């Protein structure tokens, strides 16, 4: 499992759209599995689940992305999981970390 969290300022829709675009452009086998959106008052919550096939270890890894916005305050949580091979030992060869790194790099480019 790999995890990245960041608090930042920005426009909620801009952040979620940019993250989605960067995640989807990170690999041909990237797939958005599902999404959920919720708003109450000035607070918006978006949850996205992605998965990607990794040829190097013959498995899929998932990325759970949660973005919470309240006004211009944004909180992003990205958790990568799966991607491992084996029953007893879970050798992922960094698949989860690669997916989380896409989110971190995207946020860094946003400033």
Could you say what each language-model-derived stretch is?
Residues 20-63:
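Ser/Thr-rich, low-complexity intrinsically disordered terminal regions
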Residues 18, 22-25, 29, 64, ...:
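Conserved mixed alpha/beta catalytic, RNA-binding, or beta-rich assembly cores of soluble enzyme
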């Amino acid at each position: 499992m790999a995890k990245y969290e960041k608090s930042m300022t920005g426009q909620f829709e801009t952040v979620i759209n940019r993250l989605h675009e960067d995640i989807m452009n990170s690999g041909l086998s990237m797939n958005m599995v599902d999404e959920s959106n919720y708003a109450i008052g000035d607070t918006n919550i978006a949850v996205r689940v992605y998965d990607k096939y990794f040829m190097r270890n013959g498995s899929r890894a998932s990325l759970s992305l949660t973005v919470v916005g309240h006004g211009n305050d944004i909180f992003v949580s990205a958790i990568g999981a799966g991607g491992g091979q084996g029953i007893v030992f879970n050798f992922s060869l960094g698949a989860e970390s690669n997916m989380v790194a896409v989110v971190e790099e995207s946020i860094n480019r946003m400033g």
